[in-house]
């Protein structure tokens, strides 16, 4: 049985926030706003990292920011759950089936207000990996970024809660 170590998970999520810098085409993205591991059952946040380091710890702004993340994770989890059960949605432009080490999963992209989001179930687990980026962050790069991140989470494939 694999145990989640919060320091390792937090470090991983912080690394996923880094921007893309494509030298060959002179293109650089902003950092992700947030990276989270949430439960597929109820959308609860297990761990998260944000790129907004300007917010003082334990301030009202930090509390509001965390509350916003909680609300967004619930909304995304509900949308993901709907789409997982809707075979038509799985053939849309916002669903990207991927295979990682013979495990299959689907990456979904969504727009929430002025943000781009990307979510994927860690294969055969009760966990979702969720990225939130500015609206200018290209969906295609967001999908590539989450797929590469998933390849680093193979120890969590099959992870079940409780």
Swiss-Prot record:
Membrane-topology descriptor: Single-pass membrane protein
Membrane-spanning ranges: 127-144
Domain of life assignment: Eukaryota
GO terms for MF: identical protein binding
GO biological process terms on file: endocytic recycling; microautophagy; positive regulation of TOR signaling; protein transport; signal transduction
Coiled-coil regions, chain positions: none
Record-level GO cellular component terms: cytoplasm; fungal-type vacuole membrane; late endosome; late endosome membrane; Ragulator complex
Protein's UniProt keywords contain DNA-binding: no
Cellular localisation: Vacuole membrane
Keyword Methyltransferase: no
Disruption phenotype: Abnormal activation of TORC1 signaling. Abnormal punctate localization of TOR1. Sensitive to high hydrostatic pressure (mechanical stress).
Keywords annotated in UniProt: Autophagy, Membrane, Protein transport, Transmembrane, Transmembrane helix, Transport, Vacuole
Note: Present with 3490 molecules/cell in log phase SD medium.
Function noted in UniProt: Component of the GSE complex, a GTPase complex required for intracellular sorting of GAP1 out of the endosome. Component of the EGO complex, a complex involved in the regulation of microautophagy.
The protein's assembly and partners: Component of the GSE complex composed of GTR1, GTR2, SLM4, MEH1 and LTV1. Component of the EGO complex, at least composed of GTR2, SLM4 and MEH1.
UniProt protein name: Protein SLM4
Species name: Saccharomyces cerevisiae (strain ATCC 204508 / S288c) (Baker's yeast)
